[in-house]
Curated annotation (Swiss-Prot):
Segment forming the signal sequence: 1-19
Protein name: Toxin Ts4
InterPro entries with a match to the protein in the record: LCN-type_CS_alpha_beta_dom (IPR044062), Scorpion_toxin-like (IPR003614), Scorpion_toxin-like_sf (IPR036574), Scorpion_toxinL (IPR018218), Scorpion_toxinL/defensin (IPR002061)
Cysteine-cysteine disulfides: 31-81, 35-57, 43-62, 47-64
Pfam families: Toxin_3 (PF00537)
Single GO term (MF): sodium channel inhibitor activity
Organism for this UniProt entry: Tityus serrulatus
Positions of the propeptide removed during maturation: 82-84
Protein function: Not toxic. Induces an immune response similar to that induced by whole venom. Induces a dose dependent release of the neurotransmitters glutamic acid and gamma aminobutyric acid from rat brain synaptosomes. Thus, polyclonal antibodies raised against this protein can neutralize the effects of the venom.
Domain notes: Has the structural arrangement of an alpha-helix connected to antiparallel beta-sheets by disulfide bonds (CS-alpha/beta).
Amino acid sequence: MKRMILFISCLLLIDIVVGGREGYPADSKGCKITCFLTAAGYCNTECTLKKGSSGYCAWPACYCYGLPDSVKIWTSETNKCGKK
């Protein structure tokens, strides 16, 4: 039983370490990448170009999974979109 708990704990830890971050990637202006009126698969392409594992359109902005630490992720606390 202890081995099973240890095994499951290791799997969860691997998922956290390898899984990467998720969120709305920010563009050069600090804004979310919009997917309003874009083709199907646009966000998945944008996310994989940023070395993420996948992504989808969480209308109206792209949401990515598995992003590396080097990619800026938009947050409401650090929102600089449209501000000078």
